[in-house]
Amino acid sequence: MTAALSRICSLTPRSLAAGLRISLLIAAFTASSTCGALIYETTSPYHHIRVVDDHGIRTLYFDNAAESSMSLSNNAGGHFEYTEYFHMPWLWNTQICEVLMIGLGGGSTQHAFEHYYPDVSFRTIEIDPAVARVARDYFTVRESDKQKVEISDGRVFLRRSRAKYDLIILDAYLSGRYGSSIPQHLATKEFFELARDHLTANGVLVYNVAGTVSGWHSDIVGAMYRTLGVVFPQVYLFPVTTSMNVVLLATCSPVRANLDGVRWRAAQMTQARRITIPGFRQRVEAFRSAAPANASRCPILTDDFAPVEGLSGGYGNPDRTRSP
């Protein structure tokens, strides 16, 4: 915060006003993260972790960023809206049986898949043992025949595994000097090639990116879109309407989708009760097939060059709105 204020001192009056508004927003985000009753707190090699209860909602914080939330009365509710876009792959692959997720957090997605798709096998890779303990002790995450949690780095796991998945979900962030950002080694062309090799013929990969299509942190969204496009035949975007997140969806299928087709599939799947998550057809309206306007000038991220933290700037604590 001190560095931010010192930069503001050198700005013009108009820029100063804008900078002060940004500083006030940052302060508001930080203040909001301390509301409610602190239930648990610890520090791991990766995060300062807190669990906070407020008005029937339990929220997991990494540093000052709200990472996951859960209704205390229904562990499949109270989640952030962006996680609902992790259900979109069913519109491209109606036979999802095996799912791999990198990043556990408070287990919002794990709870949702367990609730809505009880026959799906779901394996989660989480690098931080402290996060896995918190998810178990405070967010009711339980292992079963269909739900498995393994402590490992996601890329290392894929390199050592021979398993194939119908869906791979990525929602992993690390804390850095400027806030939280996507782990560099999970954002490169080489990583996506590795992930693609672990997908089935009609497999789908989805990736939560903290940013917007145009404006706040749009460069990291553009770079991720462009990098995925080097590896996968088709890439789509779902900008989240209530928070600063974009969910990218990449398919192994070369068939290009459009909004009308996606709407039709969503109608078929919901009418057949294959998808019963509330508001699913409304979420479909966020679908975008066009590349972000800035994508062509954003870098293709590689193991040799992946300035992820610089492109995203560290997201701090963006405003994420819960879904019922």
Which residues fall in each region the model found?
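N-terminal secretory signal peptides that target proteins for export/translocation
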Residues: 1-15
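Sec-dependent signal peptide recognition
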Residues: 7, 17-25
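N-terminal signal peptide c-region/cleavage motif recognized by signal peptidases
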Residues: 31-32
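Soluble small-group transferase modules, centered on the S-adenosyl donor enzyme superfamily
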Residues: 35-59, 63-68, 236-324
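Acidic/histidine-rich, surface-exposed loop or edge segments in extracytoplasmic proteins
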Residues: 63-71, 205-208
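Extended Gly/Ser/Thr-rich low-complexity repeat segments
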Residues: 72-76
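The AdoMet/dcAdoMet-binding core of the Class I SAM-like
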Residues: 77-207, 214-224, 231
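Histidine- and/or cysteine-centered catalytic micro-motif in compact active-site loops
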Residues: 173, 210-212, 240, 253
